[in-house]
Amino acid sequence: AGLLTPQQGRVQRGFTRCAVMFQQPRLLPWQRTLDNIALGLRAAGHARAQAREAAAQMGRRVGLDEAALQAWPHQLSGGMQSRAALARALVLSPELLLMDEPFAALDIGLKAQLQQLLLAETARHGSALLMITHDPAEALRLADRVLVLAGRPGRIVHEQRLSVAPAARS
């Protein structure tokens, strides 16, 4: 973001379209769900009508109906808020998608549904996905490469490359 100057080395960024999905949905309470989903597109300079149409389409893909798209964030269940947050990230068709425990608080059915959508969307757009999870099964389901980290000081203690594509795993 350019907020800090590197003390050594240099920072290179090869991706121009990036999106982030946090562990908490982080929806703006003063924006309806549809406008929360369209937020990144609007920030990127898309016309309001175009951004809202793309947001509505992605909202429907993640399972949000018209009532949910017109609702305020506090009117949505936790699962619906997570759907909106995922839609907000995916609508950007990111080259790089950063996710921090995106499915941690979801029930198993919704988690599986959103994971399948995530795999389909990242494959469709050729997105790189970097995800933090404490769920080894989730990592094995979604990743082609898993890094296990240990803390203090943070370091990689194990790396596993998976030979079967995520979409082919059950």
Regions found by a protein language model. Name each.
Residues L34-R42, R52, A56, R161:
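Short helical segment in ABC ATPase nucleotide-binding domains corresponding to the A-loop/adjacent helical element
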Residues A49-A67, A120:
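Conserved ABC ATPase "signature" region
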Residues W72-L76, M80:
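Conserved ABC ATPase signature
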Residues L86:
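Hydrophobic anchor residue at the start of the ABC signature
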Residues L92:
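Conserved signature/switch motifs of ABC ATPase nucleotide-binding domains
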Residues L97-E101:
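Catalytic Walker B motif of ABC-type/P-loop ATPase nucleotide-binding domains
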Residues K111-H125:
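Helical segment within the ABC ATPase nucleotide-binding domain
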Residues G126-I132:
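Conserved H-loop
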